[in-house]
Amino acid sequence: VSVIKLVNIKKSNAFQQQLNTLNDVYLNNAYSNQFIWQDGKASFEFSNAQKKFKSGKKSFLGAAISYNANFDAAGNVLYGLRRTQDTLNGQYQFLDLSYAQFVRLDNRYVLAKKLNLNSSIHFKAEAGAGIPYGNTKTSLPYDYSFYAGGSNDNRGWRARALGPGAYKYHLDTNRTLTQIGDIRIGASLEYRFSLGETLKGAIFTDVGNIWTYNEDSRNAQFKIQNMIREMALAAGFGLRV
């Protein structure tokens, strides 16, 4: 079943002026109005049964594993039709709007292992990639882009404040304009332990980053030889209720 989306980003004059000043092809495409004809979407999810193990008079859950994957493809049907072409940027259009063409795959693996009644270890790995091609020669649309940082990702950075690649600078005060990408790799390892009946402590390590699929002015393209040294690492301690 095809899903049709019209991405209409309402940009303030100041925001548009900043885009014009940056003159970045990648960002201009990511924040442009686009017609998205989603050719197909597929999802897969697996979760094992959590078995209980006894320790004296009490019982606790053993290892729990979950995996889910999501695949999206867009623009291929419209590209096959190739209606009208915008002579200014060379893109084909539908309803006078350039349409996006890409494939995107996102994977998430989670392992939770109870060590004893008062402690557990948690591991998470995520990897995703989107490939813009055909009618989209620069980047994924904003709605399908990846970002890094935040409480559910790399906790050493604010949400959308990490990357892409070795890029170190924020060109906007809100730190959201430039920190998007087409590829994401990340993992976290966390040890949780009881500090009482309602309070738990957590020691964690997070690693990961985002990259662009194509080369851009920020030198943020994903390259195997640079991947390890461009990984961002954070470690810390937290409290959970």
Spans of model-derived segments:
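Hydrophobic alpha-helical transmembrane segments and adjacent short intramembrane/lumenal linkers
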Residues: 182, 197-199, 229
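C-terminal outer-membrane beta-barrel translocator/porin domains of Gram-negative envelope proteins
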Residues: 1-193, 204, 211-213, 220
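C-terminal beta-signal and terminal closure region of outer-membrane beta-barrel proteins
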Residues: 148-156, 217-241
